[in-house]
Amino acid sequence: MAIRKYKPTTPGRRASSVSMFTEITRSTPEKSLLRPLSKTGGRNSHGHITTRHRGGGHKRRYRVIDFRRNDKDGVLAKVAHIEYDPNRTANIALLHYFDGEKRYILAPKGLTQGTVIESGAAADIKVGNNLPLRNIPTGTTIHNVELKPGAGAKLARSAGASIQLLGKEGSYAVLRMPSSEIRRVDIRCRATVGEVGNAEQINIRWGKAGRMRWKGWRPTVRGVVMNPVDHPHGGGEGKTSGGRHPVSPWGQKEGRTRKPKRYSDDMIVRRRRANKNKKR
């Protein structure tokens, strides 16, 4: 994916860049695979904010993605188009199965229009093919990996993400995650060969607040500039430092949010490396 940088004709364009969409072969999505997508504005069913800084943005329609591919084993499919999906960072590929059905999948790097792919234990080790982990050779780069057999892919689904299959131990496969964490997964789980495409998406600079509003992101306001009624750090005469250790608007102390005794921790062989550049 090529990235286009604008000339600095305005302050907003000076720092902005956009994708050239060179891999996209069709601009209109498949109508039968679209679903309505209503916005929540970051609120739950009670109207309470559960995710801050969300709201507005361009109207979208959800593209139904096949994250399982287990009911099409042995059926060949031809890549009809590579399309843009506003709901995710990765591009999507429209498959025309030889039995007449159409489905979307995540577009791996190197998958082009006209390529024939398949799924199942007997499929070749080829970019875009979907197989159980027990049938994939050690050292293969994979993505779209399941955590539970038949539950659909949960791991390595964003643009440029990939997982390496390090080995197989009994009924488990050992995987190196994008975070460098090494964990075990049931060997019956399925994965797709290759890495997710559109890897340069991370290099796009949005340039101005307006483009983030188009994407549905609202401003982030510091607690120290709020009133005391709105944030524990708010208030004070003049410019203050907050007067206490950093907390959330609800008084929750800043720090790690992951559960220390999560049930899936037993599958972790080695923790991910700490970010050395993180300020402490």
From Swiss-Prot:
Coiled coil: none
Name the record gives this protein: Large ribosomal subunit protein uL2
Keywords carried by this UniProt record: Ribonucleoprotein, Ribosomal protein, RNA-binding, rRNA-binding
Region (Disordered): 29-58, 225-280
Gene Ontology CC entries for this record: large ribosomal subunit
Signal sequence region: none
Pfam families: Ribosomal_L2, Ribosomal_L2_C
Biased composition (Basic and acidic residues): 253-269
Keyword RNA-binding part of the UniProt annotation: yes
Function: One of the primary rRNA binding proteins. Required for association of the 30S and 50S subunits to form the 70S ribosome, for tRNA binding and peptide bond formation. It has been suggested to have peptidyltransferase activity; this is somewhat controversial. Makes several contacts with the 16S rRNA in the 70S ribosome.
Family the UniProt entry places it in: Belongs to the universal ribosomal protein uL2 family.
Record InterPro entries: NA-bd_OB-fold, Rib_uL2_dom2, Ribosomal_uL2, Ribosomal_uL2_bac/org-type, Ribosomal_uL2_C, Ribosomal_uL2_CS, Ribosomal_uL2_dom3, Ribosomal_uL2_RNA-bd_dom
Gene name per UniProt: rplB
Record-level Gene Ontology MF annotations: rRNA binding; structural constituent of ribosome; transferase activity
GO biological-process terms attached to the record: cytoplasmic translation
Composition skew (Basic residues), residue ranges: 45-58, 270-280
Quaternary structure (record): Part of the 50S ribosomal subunit. Forms a bridge to the 30S subunit in the 70S ribosome.
